[in-house]
């Protein structure tokens, strides 16, 4: 197979080739390392690439394959977001304020290694994962492989840029307010925010006051399912998510909703709105019952989300070895968060139950809710460079208003690549499922992928 085609083949196909002996783990890794050396100076997807260590891991994986061992990801390379600990490597959180190297792997990394994955390196993030654009004073700007003067999104922007450009077959991201779904939308990828606590955050349990989760960034639904099966901590049948991605979803009742959950005035783009109704037409053609209905978003939704968001950032800032080295904008946001007490956080966490029940009441009648992905396309690199904390947040939330509410409720939500906007940049629609029902989202997303394939699309920088 041509090296470029191999780079874009996807993790599931690569795992099969490795198991069948049609490919070796060192050969596959070298495809990615060579592409990184050639392309990543343009993108800055990676903060660090572990060339020697990854090569040693690939050699060890091949020895296990040669000995007849078979694991779901044995020999498959993966990129890790730089808010997740890898033993012997610094976790920077996109900041100059970081401390020394981690002494042990995070639980999610341990699970990936147990499944046989080869760790390529760590991907870039905005400082403390705050913004939906991946730019920091410490590590520069990560660029979108579809258009180099645009952001890939954030905060998992490095992970998404790497997968989109064929610098990794799959990547680990995290999502506390859209940080998987935003960059997957703008990079043309499938991204899944799993159910809260589906994947371990250890040693950073409770990140962002319960809002944040880890999850997969992938070219295809099957690749994401493979990663989810390898990392889930919730007991269930072995391989349940790969099985879900391979089955038909059955006839579902699906609600289309374009109502913006935020109290701020937001104008969603015409193409982004049209994508929802186009998705509805396709879903009807596929045999589903489709209605137009909005969830009940209480006015207090963001009064619950925002204090937890700000306090989470304040906690992260306090945990830095050198908080004085944080960017001024980050310090300002952290100061806002410091005004919210532990008692206030406990009250908000308790109130979440009632809020979530009200928002989730729509799922008494429907299986899945479809919304726009982002409201507009990605910002230009440096667009917010001279802005302060509050003005930046007010502007960026208008681009991505459909994501945060589902971090509050904790249920799974995925973005499915749809089309391209007038600037030739990817768009998506968001699928929201019932609590703990990633399986239905994966089955439905795979059905959409079969009807409207996207994994073959390659950006200009690839």
From Swiss-Prot:
Active site (UniProt): 81 (charge relay system), 155 (charge relay system), 179 (acyl-ester intermediate)
Q: Which UniProt keywords apply?
A: Hydrolase
Q: What is this protein called?
A: Putative amidase AmiB2
Q: Which family does it belong to?
A: Belongs to the amidase family.
Species of origin: Mycobacterium tuberculosis (strain ATCC 25618 / H37Rv)
Quote one Gene Ontology molecular function term.
amidase activity
| Enzyme Commission number | 3.5.1.4
The taxonomy runs: Bacteria, Bacillati, Actinomycetota, Actinomycetes, Mycobacteriales
InterPro entries found in the cross-reference section = Amidase (IPR000120), Amidase_CS (IPR020556), Amidase_dom (IPR023631), AS_sf (IPR036928)
Gene designation: amiB2
